Design a protein with these regions (language model features):
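A short, small-residue-rich loop immediately preceding and capping a beta-strand
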Residues: 94-117, 121-132
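A glycine/threonine-rich phosphate-anchoring loop and its flanking beta-alpha core
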Residues: 118-213
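Short glycine-/acidic-enriched loop or helix-start segments at secondary-structure transitions
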Residues: 52-54, 113-115, 139-140
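Active-site segments that bind and position negatively charged phosphate/pyrophosphate groups
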Residues: 211-232
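Predominant activation on well-ordered alpha-helical scaffold segments within soluble catalytic domains
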Residues: 27, 85-88, 187-191, 201-205, ...
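Residue-level detector of flexible, active-site-proximal loop/helix-junction positions
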Residues: 74-76, 109, 134
Length: 232
């Protein structure tokens, strides 16, 4: 089951797809992300590229894109202005224009900096985010992890509401993750639900056992509830 959610903002909407095996449908999703597939640039780190490279590249090629890549090691604590500069340099070197597609595969920090760079490039270039951590799945459609000035100066330098066109959350990554790696996501989820309505909080508390057990419908609901609450 792959459920679709449109999160509407003032001038545009974010297309969020959530479910087990969502990455298996990437080709179809990528093909509809832009008017006419031409060029696509993927940003990820070495570990993410090794794990998802074949799936993502094949999906882009099948959708009609010529694919370029940038390997970038972004700190989970937050991307830096130097990371953003590296992305801008790669966009220029690969001839990416506002008619093309920029894709981020990784954690919240990686998705955030790529989304921001795509939004600035050529007046705005379409962006697709493939979050690979639970906390990123809960946040990247609506909330940016701030860029910091540098690895030495960790004060937030840039933050804005992200505007990706497409976010794809494959819940199989949550099911197979180490429980320790899910803790931040649980913290984000509880904090978000606490700030939501009482009825939504009650719905959430009733499904906590199913969420912890990795039950698909409960996880899909959790991601969608979180995105909706964070939008507001």
């Amino acid at each position: 089951m792959i459920r679709r959610q449109l999160i509407n903002f003032q001038n545009r909407s974010v297309d969020v797809r959530v479910g087990l095996g969502a990455f298996d449908e990437l080709s179809r999703m990528f093909a509809s992300a832009v008017g006419k597939p031409k060029r696509a640039m993927v940003v990820w780190n070495d570990a993410t590229s090794e794990r998802f490279g074949e799936v993502v590249e094949r999906a882009l090629v099948d959708a009609g894109f010529a694919v370029s890549q940038l390997s970038l090691e972004v700190s989970p604590a937050g991307a830096t202005l130097a990371d953003a500069d590296a992305i801008f340099g790669a966009l220029s070197a690969n001839g990416v224009t506002c008619d093309d597609l920029v894709i981020a595969v990784g954690d919240a920090a990686t998705c955030s900096v790529v989304s921001w760079c795509a939004n600035q490039w050529c007046g705005r270039t379409e962006c697709a985010l493939l979050p690979t951590t639970f906390d990123a799945m809960l946040t990247v459609a609506t909330t940016m992890k701030p860029l910091v000035a540098s690895s030495v100066n960790a004060l937030p330098a840039i933050a804005f509401r992200p505007e990706p066109g497409l976010v794809v959350c494959d819940l199989g990554l949550v099911r197979e993750a180490d429980p320790e790696d899910l803790k931040l996501g649980y913290v984000v989820l509880v904090g978000t639900m606490l700030s939501s309505s009482k009825s939504r909080w009650n719905q959430f508390t009733e499904t906590v056992p199913e969420i912890l057990a990795g039950e698909e419908v409960a996880l899909v609901n959790a991601v969608q509830w979180s995105q909706t609450a964070r939008k507001d």
